[in-house]
From Swiss-Prot:
It comes from Lentinula edodes. This is Serine protease inhibitor. Keywords: Acetylation, Protease inhibitor, Serine protease inhibitor. Inactive at pH 2.0, activity is restored after 10 minutes incubation at pH 8.0. The lineage of its organism: Eukaryota, Fungi, Dikarya, Basidiomycota, Agaricomycotina. Disulfide bonds: none annotated. The modification N-acetylserine is found at S1.
Amino acid sequence: SLETGRYLIHNGNNIVSRNLAEDRSLNPKRIVLLEPTDKIQLTWIIEKSGDEYILNNRGAPTAHIEDHVFALLIHQEGATKWSIEAVPRHGRNAYIIKGSDGKGWVAPDKAGEQIIYRTLIVGPSEPPTFPLNQVFQIIKLE
């Protein structure tokens, strides 16, 4: 399991984060897939909370709102407690990220688009396999 700390989250070569340029409103901010770039601001703080995790990006906890993933600037008590499950068949730092309803994070088809929240596809093997757009690399920063 992951410990509380600072991490990067990737899907393949792309980075998962809030957009670098956002409007100034307090509305929830989209969590998107970004092309590889300067990673300094794109750090996640992952907080362990029992068997679940709160995923914070640039100071804001994340939640699923309908079928997408957002960072909450206000009403942060509505943050989703995520389940993060290792999928070692996909590599050392490979995980799927799920909500309590069993749906999970799915990367969009191209950079700049928002992380999708939907039912995950599980390959009928033991251990199970997942499409690569459902597998996220979570890398601890020292």
